[in-house]
Swiss-Prot record:
Annotated site, Important for acyl-CoA specificity, chain positions: E111
The entry's keywords: Acyltransferase, Amino-acid biosynthesis, Cytoplasm, Methionine biosynthesis, Transferase
Keyword Transferase: yes
Gene that produces this protein: metAA
Alphabetized InterPro entries for the sequence: Class_I_gatase-like, HST_MetA, MetA_family
Source organism (scientific name): Desulfovibrio desulfuricans (strain ATCC 27774 / DSM 6949 / MB)
Record-annotated active site: C142 (acyl-thioester intermediate), H235 (proton acceptor), E237
Gene Ontology MF: a single term: homoserine O-acetyltransferase activity
Protein's name in the database: Homoserine O-acetyltransferase
CC per GO annotation: cytoplasm
Length: 314
């Protein structure tokens, strides 16, 4: 089944060229089923690239999904055309009185700052609190995962001596978790970050379960026991060339970055990067949509807030 997006969204043509099933709004109105309502809070500076990456994964599920793109008002984007934001994005005030089946909150390149110093921190707090009461399941990615763990559970982030960048192998700690249905015993995923959360803090928090970790990259997947929150410190959504673009950007800035690990053949940045996480990325997002959203969310969106209250009290 497809995702439903505007026909003139730049991602539409790109995804159709990759044989990803998308449906324009005009075609979708003829179908008499309730699609899932998913909101993507896009905090990345390269918003068009990020929305395309996530839509590629969401569009490969057997479910029809309505997508709402959300931006922050407190931060002015310098890397995305204003007309794109005005045409395709909403603000929190425009959606706060409704409910959603699922939410995805992306990472952001602000991890060098204390959380409270991020210019949209208070707005993000409102969004996260809203998600806790009006969204059935929320997926937090990279910095957003650290931000949510800090906000809801007081779990701190720690600076790393050097940036983690590359493709790393991960051990599945709870193979019966439905997010891992169809997974191999281990899986690879990209990481790109300067900070981490530590396993000990996760294990000390009774509302949370540590699902997967990497010997090199550390904590990777965490969930709240009622499935209402999923925290991913890596970037399964990344394209083949995303780490390459980040590496070359940092080289151009004179930062002397390390070559991303386990990424280029023979660690040669002139070679085409390997992409060995695509299958698990598609499977993870399909499992999240199906098992944590579609199979559990109420048919009526208006019942989500009541359902979330019941789950929180269970």
């Amino acid at each position: 089944m497809p995702i439903k997006i505007p026909a003139d969204l730049p991602a539409c043509a790109a995804l159709e060229s990759e044989n990803i099933f998308v449906m324009t709004e005009d075609r979708a109105v003829a179908q008499d089923i309730r699609p899932l309502e998913i909101v993507i809070v896009n905090l990345m500076p390269t918003k068009i690239a990020t929305e395309t990456q996530l839509l590629r994964l969401l569009g490969n599920s057997p479910l029809q999904v309505n997508i709402t793109l959300l931006r922050t008002e407190a931060h002015e984007s310098k890397n995305t055309p204003a007309q794109h934001l005005e045409r395709f994005y909403k603000t929190f005030n425009e959606i706060r009185h409704g409910s959603f089946d699922g939410m995805i909150v992306t990472g952001a390149p602000v991890e060098h700052l204390p959380f409270e110093d991020v210019d949209y921190w208070h707005e993000l707090l409102d969004i996260m609190n809203y998600a806790a009461s009006h969204v059935y399941s929320t997926l937090y990615i990279c910095w957003a995962a650290q931000a949510a763990l800090y906000h809801f559970y007081g779990i701190p982030k720690f600076s790393l001596p050097q940036k983690i960048s590359g493709i790393f192998n991960h051990d599945i700690l709870l193979p019966d978790c439905r997010l891992f249905r169809g997974f191999d015993d281990t899986f690879t995923a990209p990481h790109s970050r300067n900070t981490e959360v530590r396993a000990g803090h996760i294990l000390e928090t009774p509302q949370l379960r540590l699902l997967a970790q990497s010997e090199q990259a550390g904590v990777t997947l965490v969930e709240r026991v009622d499935h209402s929150q999923v925290f991913m410190t890596g970037h399964l959504e990344y394209d083949r060339g995303t780490l390459d673009a980040e590496y070359r950007r940092d080289v151009d800035r004179g930062l002397k970055p390390r070559v991303p690990e386990h990424y280029y053949p023979h660690d040669d940045p002139a070679a085409m990067p390997r992409m060995n996480w695509r299958a698990h990325a598609h499977l993870f997002y399909c499992n999240w949509l199906n098992y944590y959203v579609y199979q559990e969310t109420p048919f009526s969106l208006t019942a989500i807030a009541q359902n979330r209250e019941a789950r929180a009290g269970a």
